[in-house]
Design a protein with these regions (language model features):
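Short, conserved phosphate-binding/catalytic loop or strand-edge motifs used
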Residues: 13-23
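Conserved alpha/beta core surface patches that mediate binding of polyanionic ligands
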Residues: 1-15
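Glycine-rich anion/phosphate-binding loop at the beta-strand->alpha-helix junction
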Residues: 25-181
Length: 182
């Protein structure tokens, strides 16, 4: 049904006699939600026509694709793009420009991590959704998809020389890998 979308794999999840199939696609440069919906519907209709015993009904999405909402599944498997940003801040730069040290930043990061754990937060990053929203709006994307992209995991490491390594990972968001579950 599309020249841009390619089926990567189909995952199966069972609950009693019910089955959820999660069709995973690559979609080129498109976010691809409409593309994968049409392709998946076509595949499901074909399966139903095959007369598979027990297959009486299918529904597209059924909340397993977790469109426009965060989910642990999308954190682990990625829906859309997975983005990783890394930087090593030199000790001299932190001292001269930021008026702090890698040790002070690392200590604060530990407090922030513990606060995230204590509160039951889903991630340990501060407000990734603000920047993502601005990018989505500027690029004409559906701002409601920010809920999938607002989860961010950060990691900091104090280096032996006083430099500070920092990474931020946004595990899911609109982009060239999309999925639809049924």
């Amino acid at each position: 049904t599309t020249s841009s979308g390619k089926l990567r794999d189909i995952e199966q999840y069972a609950l009693g006699k019910m089955r959820w199939l999660r069709f995973n696609y690559t979609t080129g440069d498109a976010a691809g939600q409409n593309m994968v919906t049409r392709a998946t519907r076509h595949a499901c209709m074909w399966m139903k026509e095959q007369g598979i015993p027990g297959l009486e009904h299918f529904t597209l999405a059924a909340q397993m694709e977790t469109d426009k909402k965060h989910s642990a599944l999308n954190t682990l498997r990625t829906r859309g793009k997975r983005v990783v940003a890394e930087v090593t801040l030199p000790a001299a730069l932190m001292r001269e420009v930021m008026h702090t040290s890698g040790a002070a930043i690392h200590r604060q990061r530990q407090f922030a991590n513990m606060g995230a754990y204590l509160s039951g937060a889903t991630s340990n990053c501060t407000h990734a959704g603000n920047g993502i929203t601005a990018v989505f709006i500027a690029c004409g994307q559906d701002a409601a998809d920010v809920s999938e992209s607002s989860i961010c995991f950060v990691y900091g490491e104090l280096k032996d020389n006083g430099d500070y390594y920092y990474s931020a990972t946004i595990p899911a968001g609109g982009g060239p890998r999309s999925s639809l579950a049924n």
